[in-house]
Amino acid sequence: MNDFEKEIKFKSCLFFTISRLFRVVNKFAEESFADIDICPTHGYLMILLDEKREGLSVNEISENLTIAASTVTRFVDKLIEKGYVEREKQGKKSFTRITDVGIEKMPDVYIAWRKIYDKFETAITDSDYLKETTASMKKFTERLENKIDKEIKKD
């Protein structure tokens, strides 16, 4: 394989492309959340808890955010330290709820999320293309997740 073929193969690699995209998206997100004292993923968790004010279990949060339960616990611990969420025991179960302080913080969280979208719109300039790409990427991700879920169930 000559250098040109190697370069073409490298540039068309799905893993490399997705990794590059993640770095760009993550940079947009971190810049957008720089003014508030939480990271983007914590912001997404707060949005989830704001929508489900009755509280959610670690497993419910894990399923919604598609992250490991141990990661959820770490995120919740950080948000508890800041006073934005609290854990409440109900019998053997534990639920995480957004606090009044967290609810007061939500306008800042939504503004930060809007900034991320605005950065995409500014960079891409075609909102229809942005919506189509988002829908396509969501579908792509769901297909991969379904494939992985089926393989796990086989084992």
Predicted regions and their residues:
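N-terminal leader segment of winged-helix/HTH proteins
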Residues: 1-36, 82, 97, 131
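N-terminal helix-turn-helix DNA-binding core of bacterial DNA-binding proteins
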Residues: 23, 27-68
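Charged, amphipathic alpha-helical coiled-coil/dimerization segments
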Residues: 77-135
